Amino acid sequence: MYTPTASVLVGLAALKGASAWGTLGHATVAAKSVLSDTSTSYLANVASWADTYRSTAAGKFSAPYHFIDANDSPPSSCNVNYARDCTSSGCSISAISNYTQRVADARLSTASTAEALKFLVHLLGDVTQPLHDEALEVGGNDIKVTFDGYANDNLHSDWDTYIPEKKVGGDSLTDAQSWAKTLIASIDSGSYKSLASSWVAKSNINDAVTSATAWASDANALVCTVVMPNGVAALQTGDLYPTYYNKVIPTVELQIAKGGYRLADWLNKIYSANIAKRDLEGQSEELVSRMAMAAPLPPANRPNKAQLAREAYGGGCGCDKHKK
């Protein structure tokens, strides 16, 4: 499913000219080369690929990679515990770790490297969306709400798609690129300038599980403070537009800015370390081995209630179950 949010995130990482990115140029050029996509719709192609792939027979295995079901108790308590919340089928955190390793593995084919890169581009966006880091009501998919006059809606879809679309004014790639430029300006010289360095302060490609857990925890905390600070019932008493929308849209923009900035930084770290370069195969194998050892899957626990509910959605995030 194409969403402007995903393309904005990719746009943040791909647009040139923002000094806040430093050495971004070589990473994005290398990434685009690996993806073998020079079309004008490059951003949309990359942003939507993982969602499209999970809906295919070949890609069904990847459905759990788009979320981690934090078994917490919002709005009173929000927290992510990798060992508790990531199942043996995987989750966004384990997938980010795995595909970081694969992008870095010089032994893989160009096609396999491109696939890993496309997963990373998408999943670093998913992990910044608070409801992709929450188990309650299948990440908000089963929280029925009204948004902008549409009564047959759900909270997850609003955060994934309809709140961003309302802000952007549409769902075209041009809209997404325009929004990305605005957010880049905020990072480069505006309200995010003093914050941006903290978003990547602990990013470490050699310990991707810890990095991704920190990102998921950061977003999950917002479930308690922003997404549903007064509980589920408070969201179902009237239209979420405009009052709720006006309260949460600054956070939506902040999270998208974080995702794009982290993605750019993550790709830079991979490529500037020369991990993925084919002519450094020996060095790559050493680094890949170290990264793989640091990223085991959590133990196979018995499925809890939230995970069983997720299985009823076919194992996916449920994002495409409700469409206007």
Model-based region annotation:
Residues 1-20, 324:
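Fungal secretory targeting signals
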Residues 16-121, 130-239, 243, 248-257, ...:
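N-terminal, motif-rich segments that launch catalysis or mediate targeting to/interaction with membranes
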